[in-house]
Amino acid sequence: MTNPLSLLALPPRFGPTLRRIVFIWLALLCLPVSGQELAAEPTIVRYFSKGNTEGLRAYQLELVKLLLEKTRATHGDYSLIIVDSDLSAARAKAETEKGELINTHYATEWSGEFVNAENVYVLPHSVLKGLLGMRSLIVREDRLRDFERIYQHNQLALFKAGQRTDWPDVEILEYNKLPTILTEQFTSLRPMLQAHRFDYLPLSILEAPAVSAPFNTGSNALAISPSTAIFYPLAMHLCVSKTKPKIAERLGAGFTIASEDGSIDALFEKHFGFVATLLAQKKLTTLILNNPLISPTENKRLIAEFINNYGPYTKTVYSE
């Protein structure tokens, strides 16, 4: 096959017409290609999946996929990379800010060593319908009766809670004068509870069943208190590195579409439909606590929202 550039060196008696043809052809090759002729590069989302317990992870991942699918027509294809490294909360946030290893991450707050909230977009959309802060109490099954008799904050303060060191719940519980035993690894909490190192493990009503289920048999069986829960305002948001504004814009657009067409509600019901059945029994005494990590105004707003949405299904008792 003749090299088209070699035509430029043809003898003069053949050159002028062919040279004009080649120049026109080369000029056309240099024109920009339209979006219809060349597909745009896919959105590359590097999603950190280890920030929460197994009771929330499946829903959170499916929600990210839903938001990306809802915007496929407007924003094109995507590549979703799951980052499941065992990182501390602060390290995962720092990596998210850089936007290289991780660029998308669920979080309840953005603080910690070497962490700067100015480096992420916090999408304002509701993720868990105000129920993340409604904490079921996972206890040893042989101590369920001890938690049947808790009706006031000072009664719960006689027991010790267990928490992971870098969770925001630690500051909330300690602020409300609830004794807390800490560990750096979430996987240590259940064996510690079984060994009487502390008395209860407060986890969201959404995740507690999945977390306790593998430990609900045998002499050291764990169970969820059917009579006592606590609530403190704790919202979860999808956060995106400010190095990736297009991802933040796309996920925000996906939230709008999925909220309007009801698909977020359907996804929530798929994963957490059991909560409505549980609340309908109207047996839970729920102790209301304040969250010192947010403003008094925000505390008041979120507590009022919880009471409005779920108050008819639970007996609420305010902290002293």
For each predicted feature, which ranges?
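A conserved helix-loop-strand patch within extracytoplasmic ligand-binding domains
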Residues: P124-D169
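A ligand-binding cleft/hinge motif common to bilobed small-molecule-binding domains
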Residues: T96, T104-E118, Y200-A221
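Extracytoplasmic small-molecule ligand-binding "clamshell" domains
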Residues: L38-E118, L251
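Short loop->beta-strand "edge-of-pocket" segments that line small-molecule binding or catalytic clefts
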Residues: E41-R57, E148-D166, Y200
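Short helices/loops that flank or line small-molecule/ion binding pockets
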Residues: I82-T104, Y175-N176, T187-L206
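Periplasmic-binding protein-like
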Residues: K50, G130-S136, R140-R143, A213-G252, ...
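Ligand-binding cleft/hinge of the Venus flytrap
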Residues: V64-S79, R149-Q155, R164-Q185, S212-S219
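An extracytoplasmic/periplasmic, membrane-proximal ligand-sensing/linker region
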Residues: S259-E320
